[in-house]
């Protein structure tokens, strides 16, 4: 089968089309014939070596890239009872989705409802589940809360804005252009700050009457994290869940104290999908919201599998206005 793999860490040029044997599902696994693979910043971090020392997301070389996919069940390993060959499924947080086939633990597969297109289901896995755990668990938003969402026109950002509004929160969003601001606004953001024209921290304080927000969801990282911390209300929470501008290497404890005894966390999605019940519950919420026309899923571009290097370059240039997918050939 064809895969996109790396033999060494580095830039997008390290992504190569390779031939690998088709995997055989072990006991408790299902073989998935992939039609789509999601493209995410976690793929960039793994490709570049940022996660080389991670225990949660291990990166042995050589390595087939990709942590999210959608397709149909092609075969079942021993002991798998809840799936059948031909089921449409999607999944995330299993390495190796930039491929024609993947062997996936059966409990990590989500059966896709008939009314949900497979590209949408794939797009809702890593990014949708991220938006869900951020808004429902890391800081459980509700009426009366105000949140700041960075990169609100991106794949996670658009979903996070919508879920926050569904939970009754007020959303302040940041965007890098008028076009992206319009996207964030269309998804329900109450206020949008053009961060290239305005200091977002000053704007947040103006909007909130000097109080700050309850929670900041920051996927930008290095360029924004200090101002994100200082955009919080007293005892607020800064959630750093990505590093589009570079990974955050450290945060000084005194900085948190001086910002108003605020809190800081850097969560992993895997820790919020630790059981089948948690995974299936979050996915069911997302599919239900999509089916009720309460959650719009924007797919920005679909690249052929062989164009994975171009797809990574596009993602890293921070040009995205929604989800990026790879189309996997037959």
Where do the PLM segments sit?
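Short amphipathic alpha-helix with an adjacent loop that forms part of the alpha/beta core around
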Residues: 200-210
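C-terminal capping/lid region of NAD(P)-dependent oxidoreductase domains
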Residues: 292-301, 309-330
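Glycine-rich phosphate-binding loop and adjacent beta-alpha segment
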Residues: 223-294, 327-330
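Mid-domain Rossmann-like dinucleotide-binding core that forms the NAD(H)/NADP(H) cofactor-binding site
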Residues: 84, 88, 122-198
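Short, surface-exposed secondary-structure boundary micro-motifs
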Residues: 35-36, 76-78, 94, 152, ...
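A structural motif shared across PLP-dependent enzymes of the aminotransferase-like
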Residues: 93-106
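N-terminal glycine-rich beta->alpha transition that marks the start or flank
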Residues: 11-13, 20-70
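A glycine-/small-residue-rich N-terminal strand-loop-strand element
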Residues: 70-94
